[in-house]
Amino acid sequence: MLFLNAKFIDLDLGANAVIVNEEDLKGTSYYPQDRVLIESHSGSVLGILYSTKTMVQKGEVGIPVRKMKGISLKEGEEVNLRHAEKPESIQFIKKKMDGQVLSPNEIRTIIDEIVSKKLSNIELAAFVTSTYVNGMNMEEIVEMTKRMAETGDMISWEKSLVVDIHSIGGVPGNKYALLSIPILAAAGITIPKTSSRAITSPAGTADVMEVLTNVELDEEELKRVVKATNGCLVWGGGVNLAPADDIIINVERPVSIDPQPQLLASVMAKKVATGIKYAVIDIPVGKGVKIKNEAEGAKLARKFIELGELLNIRVECVLTYGGQPLGRAIGPALEAKEALEALTDPKSAPKSLIEKAISLAGILLELGGSAQIGDGQKLAWEILESGRALEKFNQIIVEQGGTPKKPEEIELGKYVEEVRSPIDGYIVGINNTSITNVVKEAGAPRDKKAGLLLNAKIGNKVKRGDILYTIYSGSEERLNSAVNLARRVYPVNVEGMMIERISKF
Amino acid sequence: MLFLNAKFIDLDLGANAVIVNEEDLKGTSYYPQDRVLIESHSGSVLGILYSTKTMVQKGEVGIPVRKMKGISLKEGEEVNLRHAEKPESIQFIKKKMDGQVLSPNEIRTIIDEIVSKKLSNIELAAFVTSTYVNGMNMEEIVEMTKRMAETGDMISWEKSLVVDIHSIGGVPGNKYALLSIPILAAAGITIPKTSSRAITSPAGTADVMEVLTNVELDEEELKRVVKATNGCLVWGGGVNLAPADDIIINVERPVSIDPQPQLLASVMAKKVATGIKYAVIDIPVGKGVKIKNEAEGAKLARKFIELGELLNIRVECVLTYGGQPLGRAIGPALEAKEALEALTDPKSAPKSLIEKAISLAGILLELGGSAQIGDGQKLAWEILESGRALEKFNQIIVEQGGTPKKPEEIELGKYVEEVRSPIDGYIVGINNTSITNVVKEAGAPRDKKAGLLLNAKIGNKVKRGDILYTIYSGSEERLNSAVNLARRVYPVNVEGMMIERISKF
C-alpha cells in the first residue's frame, strides 16, 4: 500500500488514469497499467496506474476529474493506494481468447464494465482482437447488442411505425438522408434519424446538417422535434445511445479492425435504443469503401437481417454502388447546398443522389404500408417532386432551431482552385480515398466551407482545359496544401481513348 | 492540421503521449488514440493523441519529455499537429490476427517498432492477444528471439563456456541461485547471472541479492565483476538486455496472459544477449505456480530445447517441485539470511534448497566438462561443503560493491508475529499464493526486512501451540495488516488425522 496526497488531473485515457511519481513506485509491487484503488475517509476511486517523472511530485497521486461520478475525494487530502481486484470481465475476455462461447451473463458483464470504464485500453484491445480472431455466434451478438442498448438511453414511441435508414461505411458525398428523411416524414412515417459526425469521411450526415441547423439535441428535444415533424436529423452524440459503442470504436480505430460482431452490434444497438421497428441498411460496395465486393456485402446483409429478426426489428439491406462519391459535392457546406438544390429542383439534381434517396425511402414506404410493393420509389419521387419533402425539411430545420435557407445562401470557402484536365479524354476513375484526403486537407469537417465539387463523373468525356473539379477552403494555406495533395493523389483520372500502345509485334 | 504551442509534459503511456485540449479537437478529424506528428522548424515528434480538459490549455499541445531522444522541439514554440502514417507493423499484426505466418522481415519490423516506442498499448495488446490466440511457429519464435536480443545490448565473452540457470515462474523463496552461481563460478565456469526484481513474487533474486550488495551494474561493471570472479548476481534492468521484453510484459500483465511464443522469446533473448552457450531452465510444476502439471512442463521443456538448438545455445530443462516454497524463508532479508546460512553450514540447511541448488549446478558442471555425467551433483556438493562456494560468493559481493556479512548480521523486520497451530495434526498444505500475498502485505519487496519464515513444511507433525510460521515487517501497521490477511487466507494448513467423520450409516 502507498500513502499519497490526492492531486486532481484530467486526461482521457479510456479508463480512469491514476498517476504516481515513478520514484514512489520503485521497489514496490506496483507497476504501470496495474489496477489500483485510491481510498480515503471521504471516498474512493478505481483506476489504472501510470507513472510520471514530473506531472505529479513524489508523494502525490494524480486522480481523474473528467468523470466526477463516483469520485468523492478532495484535492490535497491524504489517500492510500492499493491493488484492486481485476474486473470480472478479464476472465471472460480470456475465455474468448481461448475460442470459447460466452454466456449471456458473461457478455453482459463485459459490456457493463466497458460502460462503467472499468477496462483499460489494453483490456479492451484484447477483447476486440479476440472477437475479431475467434468471432461470436448469433446468440452472443444478440446479447451484446441488447446490452449495449440497455446500458444507455432507451427512447420509446407511441407510434409503432418507427423506421430508420443507415449506411455502413463511408462513401464521400453520402448526403442522401437529407432527402430520404423528409420524404418519409412527409408521408407520415416516424423516422428519428441520429447520425455520426465524420469518423473517416470528410463529412458525416450530422456535419452536413449542422450547416443548416442545430444538431446537438438531447433526448427530450429530439422527441419534441419528431412529435412535431415525424422526423429529425440530429447528431447521435447528443443522446446517450449505446455508450459502449464509442468506447469500443476508440480501440478499433488504431488497429484498423472492425470485427463483424462489433459492427453488427454497433449498428443494431442504436436501432434498439431509438425504438426502431423497421430499418433499411445501405451497404455501399466498391473500391475505397468498407465492403469490397458483392459476395461480402450479401453475407453481411444476411447477418443484419437475422440479427434484426432476433431483436424484433424488420431489416432490409440494399447493396449500393460505392465506387465513386454520391452526387458531385463533398464537404459539409457543399453537400448541404447540393441536398437543398435537389429538394428544391429534383429534376436538375445528380441522378445518383436522387436515385439512392428515393429507392431507400421507397423501401420504407412499402414496408410501412404507404405504398404497394413496387410503388415505393414512385411515391418517394412524387413527394420529392411536389415540394412536400422540401417543406418538411424546412419544418425539421426550424424545429431543430435553425432558419431555412435557399441553396444560394449557403456560404462556401472563399479560397477556390479549379483543377482542369491536362488532355482530351474520358474520366476513367474517381478515387474515394484521394477525394476524402484532399477534402480533409482543405480543412473539412472542421472547416464546414471546405470541400470538393466534381464537375464530371466516371465515363464523362472531357476536353483538355475543362474543369474536372473545384476545391474550396476557408483558408488560403489549407487550399494550397489540398491542391498540392491533389497533384499527388489524383482524385479524378482522365485517360485518352488509346489505353495502351504496343510498338512491337 | 492543428496549430498549437508546445508544452512539455511527462507521462509514461507506453508510446509517446501527445496531449491536446478537447476543445481543440472538437469538429476535427483528430481523435484520441490517433497517431500524430508534431512538427516545427526545430524538429518533430511522433506520438499518440490524448485529450484533456485541463492538463493543457486551448491552443497548447503537451509533448513528452521522458524520452528526449529524437525530440528537438522547444517549449512554447509554435508547432503544427497532423495525422502520421501508421507504423508498418500494424499490417503485420493484422496478418497475425488473420492467422497467417509472419516473415522474418515482418517480425523484425514489429520488434523494432516496439523498441522505438512507435506502437501504442492498444496496438501492443492486439499483437500479444493475436499471438496468444493464433500462436507462432518455431521460425517465427527464433526470429523474434534474435531480434529482441539484437535491439538491446549484446555482451560477448572471450571464454566459450558461458552458462546460465533460469527459473520460469515464481516459487516463493526461490533463492537457490545464491548457492548455485558461486558453486559454478568456483569451478571456473563463467556464469553472468542477471535476474529480475519481484514481478508477482514477494522477492526476485535481484531483490534478495540487494540485501547483501549492489545489484544495479551497467554492462562494463558486469563484465569487470565476471572477469574477476567468473560470476555475478545482478539486476537485469541495469543492463539494456532485450528491451522489447519489458514493453511486452507491461501489456501482458493487465490481461493475465503470457503467450508461449513470448515466454520462450523473453527468456531466450536474454540468453542470446548475454552470450550464454549453455543454459539450464528450471520449470517449477505445481499448485500456485505458472505450470500446473508435468505434461505441460515437458511440452514447454521441448520447445525451449528446440529453440535453444536453433540459437546455438545448449539447453537442458528440469521440472522441479513447485508446490510449496523453496526452503523456509520468504522475503528479501530472510532469504538472503537463509542462503548465507546454507553457504556457511550446508549440512544444517533445508534439504529442498540444497538439493535444488546442487542439482541445477551439477547439470552445468557436467555440461561444462568439470564433472563426468552423473557426478555433477556430487562435485557441486563438495564445492559447497568445502566452503569454496561461500568464499566465491563473498568475492562476488565485494566486486559488486558490498561488504560480506555473517548470516546473523542480516537485519530482519523488528515487528514480529508468531502464528501457532490451533490443533494437534499434520501440515497438509502450504499455499504459495497465500504466502506471496501475506509477505507482500507485510511490505515486501520494498521493505526488504519483511517476510515469512516457515517453521514446518508439508507432512510435518505439529502439536497445538507449536509455531507454524513467523511474519516479519519493518512497520507495525503492515505487520497487523499481514497478520489479518493470514487469518483469512491460511498460508499453512493443519489437519488432524481424522479427515472426515461419518455419523450416519
From Swiss-Prot, chains A, B:
Q: What is its EC number?
A: 2.4.2.57
Disulfide bond annotation, renumbered to this chain: none
Name any GO cellular component annotation. cytosol
- Gene3D superfamilies named in the record: 1.20.970.50, 2.40.40.20, Nucleoside phosphorylase/phosphoribosyltransferase catalytic domain (3.40.1030.10), Pyrimidine nucleoside phosphorylase-like, C-terminal domain (3.90.1170.30)
Q: Does the keyword Glycosyltransferase apply?
A: yes
**Annotated positions binding AMP:** 170, 196-201, 205, 266, 290
Active site at: 258
Reactions that this protein is recorded to catalyse = AMP + phosphate = alpha-D-ribose 1,5-bisphosphate + adenine; CMP + phosphate = cytosine + alpha-D-ribose 1,5-bisphosphate; UMP + phosphate = alpha-D-ribose 1,5-bisphosphate + uracil
Instruction: List, in alphabetical order, the GO biological process terms annotated in this UniProt record.
Output: AMP catabolic process; pyrimidine deoxyribonucleoside metabolic process; pyrimidine nucleobase metabolic process
Under PANTHER family, the record lists: THYMIDINE PHOSPHORYLASE
Describe the family membership recorded for this protein in Swiss-Prot or TrEMBL: Belongs to the thymidine/pyrimidine-nucleoside phosphorylase family. Type 2 subfamily.
Summarize the protein's role. Catalyzes the conversion of AMP and phosphate to adenine and ribose 1,5-bisphosphate (R15P). Exhibits phosphorylase activity toward CMP and UMP in addition to AMP. Functions in an archaeal AMP degradation pathway, together with R15P isomerase and RubisCO.
Spell out the protein name for this chain. Answer: AMP phosphorylase
Which organism was this protein described from?
Methanococcus vannielii (strain ATCC 35089 / DSM 1224 / JCM 13029 / OCM 148 / SB)
